[in-house]
Amino acid sequence: MNNLKAHYQKTIAKELQKSFAFSSIMQVPRLEKIVINMGVGDAIRDSKFLESALNELHLISGQKPVATKAKNAISTYKLRAGQLIGCKVTLRGERMWAFLEKLIYVALPRVRDFRGLSLKSFDGRGNYTIGIKEQIIFPEIVYDDIKRIRGFDVTLVTSTNKDSEALALLRALNLPLVKG
């Protein structure tokens, strides 16, 4: 079992139950899934960019990503509906906990000039999105093998609909959020 998951089950869940006065342990907010999304605008011109993005996302997440298609046609970008323009992967269970642990303790400390994550990234429904500017902060990515530095979004989806409960959960999981 993952260290972070064991810590959540043994201590964090009980602490959150006491602090929010939940009558049942099942009411305690928990992490449901992590969605990693990478938009590849260059895939319009050359599909090799999408292939390299799929490979990088596979290395980072440990799970095969799925290519995403454009919903609408946008003539200014020469984009047609149904054209492949990105990739995403949804992590649940053990892979989710392993990725979160790697993100918190390995990747985020490698970000240059890192001062913590903003509290403004909550969506109002208890979900938190982190924008990562460079994929090279992950140890699986070899700097010499990448064609282009690209970023991606990591969305932490929680079981609660309140940002305050999700904030307490993420702070308890040691996500480096800015004091506020």
Swiss-Prot record:
Belongs to the universal ribosomal protein uL5 family. PROSITE patterns: RIBOSOMAL_L5 (PS00358). Part of the 50S ribosomal subunit; part of the 5S rRNA/L5/L18/L25 subcomplex. Contacts the 5S rRNA and the P site tRNA. Forms a bridge to the 30S subunit in the 70S ribosome. GO terms for biological process: translation. It comes from Mycoplasma pneumoniae (strain ATCC 29342 / M129 / Subtype 1) (Mycoplasmoides pneumoniae). One of its GO terms (cellular component) is ribonucleoprotein complex. NCBIfam families: PRK00010.1. Pfam families: Ribosomal_L5, Ribosomal_L5_C. Keywords: Ribonucleoprotein, Ribosomal protein, RNA-binding, rRNA-binding, tRNA-binding. InterPro entries: Ribosomal_uL5, Ribosomal_uL5_bac-type, Ribosomal_uL5_C, Ribosomal_uL5_CS, Ribosomal_uL5_dom_sf, Ribosomal_uL5_N. This is one of the proteins that bind and probably mediate the attachment of the 5S RNA into the large ribosomal subunit, where it forms part of the central protuberance. In the 70S ribosome it contacts protein S13 of the 30S subunit (bridge B1b), connecting the 2 subunits; this bridge is implicated in subunit movement. Contacts the P site tRNA; the 5S rRNA and some of its associated proteins might help stabilize positioning of ribosome-bound tRNAs. SUPFAM superfamilies: RL5-like. This is Large ribosomal subunit protein uL5. One of its GO terms (molecular function) is rRNA binding.
